[in-house]
Amino acid sequence: MAGGRYVEAVSEAEFRLGAGECLVLVGESGCGKSVLASALLGLLPGNAETAGSALLPDGLDLLAADEDTLARTVRGRRVALVPQSPAAHLTPVRTVRSHLEETVRELTGSRTPRAAAEAAAARAAFPASHLDHHPHQLSGGLAQRAATALALVGDAPLLLADEPTTGLDRDLVERTADELRAHTRDSGRALLMITHDLAAARRIADTVAVMYAGRIVELAAAEAFFGEPGPRHPYARGLLAALPERAFTPIPGAPPELGDLPPGCAFAPRCALADATCRTVRPRLTEGVACHRA
C-alpha cells in the first residue's frame, strides 16, 4: 500500500480439492476471494508477496513456481481460468473461432486447430453457428460459454471460475452453474468457483468455504451448510439470513479495512454474540470454523 504499509489480503486459507469436486468460495466483495485465485495463477502485482504452499497432485507448488514454469506448464494446461466479465477478456475485433484456434495453437502446438477449437466449443455448449461472431454480437450467456470453451481447450484438471455468474439473468445463472458442474462431474476436473451469489453456490457446490476479511472462517459440506444443521459462524449465518427467500435481514455494519484489522475476530464489531475474548483473541479455524462462540 501507499506509505510502505503491508496488508495481508489473504491469510490462513487452507483447503483440499479433489478430482470431480466443486469448492465454492463465498463472501462479500473485497474479502480476498479473487486475490486467492490470482495467487494460484501467479497473477498478483509485482510488489505482492506470498507464503505457504498450494500443491497440485504431482507436487508442483504454485506459490513457489517461477513465471516461466507457470506460463509454460500451468496456465491453461494444469489450471484454467473462467474469468469474471468474460466479454471484457475477448478481443473485440476477433471472432470466437479465432480466439479458440489461437488458444489451441498456444497450448498444444497444433497447426490444424480448427477441429480442437470446435470440440472445445461443443463441450462448453457454445453453438457452432456463432463461432464466427465477434464478442459484441454475443449475449451475456454466450460470452460466458465462449470463456468456458477457452478454459477447456487445454483439458486442465483444475478450473478456477471467478464470479462466472455476475451480471447474468437468473435463468442464465442457473444454466451457467449447471454447465460448470457438469464439466466437473463428467470429466473428473476439480472446480474452484468464486462468487458472492449464494443461490449459484447452493446449486453447484460440494463444499463451501466462507471468507471474511482475508480469512476462511468456515469450511463445510454444502448439504450441511445450506440445509441442516446450517452454518456455524455468525457471519455465514448472516449471509444466508440476507437471502430474499429467507429473513432478508442485512448484516449490520461494514467489513473492516484489510490494513486496519481489529486485534481479535475481524467480524466482532458486527457480531451480536461477540464478547471480550472475541474482541481480543483471533480465533483459528478449528473443526471447520473460526469462531469462539460456535
Please describe what each predicted stretch is.
Residues 1-230:
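ABC transporter nucleotide-binding domains
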Residues 219-294:
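Short catalytic/signature loops enriched in Gly
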